[in-house]
Amino acid sequence: MKTPGHQRVKTARRRTAASTRWLERQLNDPYVQKAQAEGYRSRAAFKLIELDERFSLLKNARRIIDLGIAPGGWSQVARKKAPQAKIVGIDLLEAAPIEGVTIFQNDFTDPEAQKKLIEALGGAADLVLSDMAANTIGHAQTDHLRTMALVEEAAVFASETLREGGSFVAKVLAGGADKDLVALLKRLFGQVKHAKPPASRRESSEWYVIAQNFRGEAYQG
């Protein structure tokens, strides 16, 4: 992916050094530039594109749930790759409307919010996507554990929502508890793999778990 020369950002009077570094990274990130050029709301769209190219997640999907939908890049990709699919998403943050996608602004961990998702989908899901991460506090292990608890809840929800043979994809932060998640998924799915798509930043601890061929039995404690 070709990129223009590295752009530097002058530190404004009210801008911190950290925010200046973030802005400079954004300006020089080829995936940010490509997302803008192709009309995607975030560079994260290319993570799903790359995962789909490797694991064929969207081709035959008819019902899709997008957990942590904001700002909407993953659902944009799903809409494009699976135009026939019913797509339902949820996030604590507001996400601007996407044509053909039903969006709820709710806390996913609220059982009532999960009921809304299931009702709106109108049937068993073929694919549950989760790009969720807990709000960080700056303590690596605490951030890891909080995010993993969220992902495990997403996995349990997927087991209650997917059709037999369906798939679950989730963002994971490395740090130890991810091993428990993989063990859980191996009980629920016939195939569990992991990947770090090229669009994931090298310095990030994130990776993605891809669980396919759901066995058809909901998680039992």
Swiss-Prot record:
Location of this chain's protein in the cell: Cytoplasm
SUPFAM superfamilies (alphabetical): S-adenosyl-L-methionine-dependent methyltransferases
GO molecular function, one term: rRNA (uridine-2'-O-)-methyltransferase activity
Catalytic residue positions: K171 (proton acceptor)
UniProt xrefs under Pfam families: FtsJ (PF01728)
InterPro entries attached to this UniProt entry: RNA_methyltr_RlmE, RNA_MeTrfase_FtsJ_dom, rRNA-MeTfrase_E, SAM-dependent_MTases_sf
Alphabetical UniProt keywords: Cytoplasm, Methyltransferase, rRNA processing, S-adenosyl-L-methionine, Transferase
The reaction(s) this protein catalyses: uridine(2552) in 23S rRNA + S-adenosyl-L-methionine = 2'-O-methyluridine(2552) in 23S rRNA + S-adenosyl-L-homocysteine + H(+)
Enzyme class: transferase
PANTHER family: RIBOSOMAL RNA METHYLTRANSFERASE, RRNA METHYLTRANSFERASE 2, MITOCHONDRIAL
Function: Specifically methylates the uridine in position 2552 of 23S rRNA at the 2'-O position of the ribose in the fully assembled 50S ribosomal subunit.
Family: Belongs to the class I-like SAM-binding methyltransferase superfamily. RNA methyltransferase RlmE family.
Protein name: Ribosomal RNA large subunit methyltransferase E
